[in-house]
Structure formats: structure tokens, C-alpha cells
Regions:
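Extended, alpha-helix-rich binding/interface surfaces that flank or overlap catalytic cores
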Residues: 91
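Membrane-anchoring alpha-helices and their flanking helix-loop junctions
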Residues: 1-83, 95-155
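Solvent-exposed interhelical
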Residues: 86
Length: 155
């Protein structure tokens, strides 16, 4: 087991990145509205995309729980997961979060939210995922390097 002080040195919590982006999108939509799909369609699509995010992330979360490792990037990772959703992506929880973010943006009828997705991905890569990858390489060595070369970061 690893010391609890030994963890990825992320810059910003992933929830803060997604929440701030959604808030900025809603503010931009209020001040500089962009046309979007009708509200009823937006609600239906938004819920569908949001649920897809849960559907993608939930099996990964269950696998993490069964492996007794943490969801919290500020805690030590005890197990390298390479099966299930982690075979599809090294970051299935973050894919789920991104789909949740997109679903909320659609639900609230803000095209700005969708336009900000590349920014969210960029910030997640730089401030969260790269520090996590450095940490996982340090902790799991060749096993993580092999997983990293065989499995995409996103999809």
C-alpha cells in the first residue's frame, strides 16, 4: 500500500474544471446568446447524453471500488486497473464526466457549453491527467507504461 501523502499532484479538481466551464457557458449564453435546438429537444438530448456519461463511468467506478482503489485523485492509487472500461480508455471516469458536462450544456440550451469542450479537455489533460500519468508511471512503472501505450487517454 502507498502512503496517503503520495498521490498525483493535480492542479485543479476535475469537478471544478467542469463546473467552471458550465458556469462560463451559461454566462456567455446569457450575454451573447447563440441559437440552439428547441428547448424540448435540448432537454431530451441533454438527459440522454448525461445518462450516457453515467453509463460509461459507472462500470469503471464499480471496478475501482471492487479493487479497493480510490476515485479521489488526491489520494494514493493502490491498484492499476487495465480491464473493463480501463481497457477502452485510461480515463473512463473523466469521459463520463465530460459526457455529463455535455449533457448539462445541451439540457440548459447553451451551445457555448459544447464549444468549450475542447477547452475542458485541454485543461483536464494539463491540470489533471498529465500529473496523474506522471504519478502512475512513478508508482506502477513498466506496467503503467505498457497500459499507456496500449490504451488511449480518452477514446
Amino acid at each position: 500500500m502507498h502512503k496517503t501523502s503520495d498521490h498525483a499532484q493535480i492542479v485543479v479538481n476535475p469537478f471544478v474544471i467542469h463546473g467552471a466551464a458550465l458556469l462560463i457557458a451559461l454566462l456567455l449564453q446569457g450575454f451573447l446568446p447563440l441559437p440552439f435546438v428547441p428547448a424540448t429537444l435540448a432537454r431530451i438530448l441533454g438527459v440522454a447524453v448525461f445518462l450516457a456519461g453515467i453509463g460509461f463511468a459507472l462500470p469503471a467506478a464499480r471496478l475501482m471500488r471492487s479493487a479497493h482503489t480510490t476515485f479521489n485523485p488526491n489520494r494514493a492509487t493502490t491498484t492499476l486497473l487495465t480491464t473493463g472500461r480501463f481497457h477502452i480508455s485510461r480515463n473512463p471516469i473523466y469521459i463520463g464526466m465530460l459526457l455529463n458536462y455535455a449533457g448539462l450544456a445541451i439540457f440548459f440550451g447553451t451551445l457555448w457549453g459544447l464549444l468549450l469542450i475542447p477547452v475542458v479537455i485541454l485543461l483536464m489533460n494539463r491540470w489533471v491527467i498529465l500529473p496523474e500519468e506522471e504519478y502512475l508511471t512513478r508508482v506502477f512503472g513498466e506496467a503503467y507504461t505498457t497500459h499507456k501505450s496500449a490504451t488511449p487517454r480518452w477514446v
